[in-house]
Amino acid sequence: GDWGTCSWPGQECEHDSDCCGSFCCVGRRCLHIYFPCNLSRS
């Protein structure tokens, strides 16, 4: 996501792109996951 306005883990999000770097948006919160975001939801 955009480093200027991105959300860090624990902050609210709507999409993975709302989260900083490669953090994933899960349950409307950014999380640090050790594999691609899409795999975490399959």
Swiss-Prot record:
Keywords: Disulfide bond, Ion channel impairing toxin, Neurotoxin, Secreted, Toxin. Its main location: secreted. PROSITE patterns: I_CONOTOXIN. Expressed by the venom duct. It is found in: Secreted. GO terms for cellular component: extracellular region. Disulfide bonds join C6-C20, C13-C25, C19-C30, C24-C37. One of its GO terms (molecular function) is toxin activity. Coiled coil: none annotated. The cysteine framework is XI (C-C-CC-CC-C-C). Belongs to the conotoxin I1 superfamily. This is Conotoxin Au11.6. The lineage of its organism: Eukaryota, Metazoa, Spiralia, Lophotrochozoa, Mollusca.
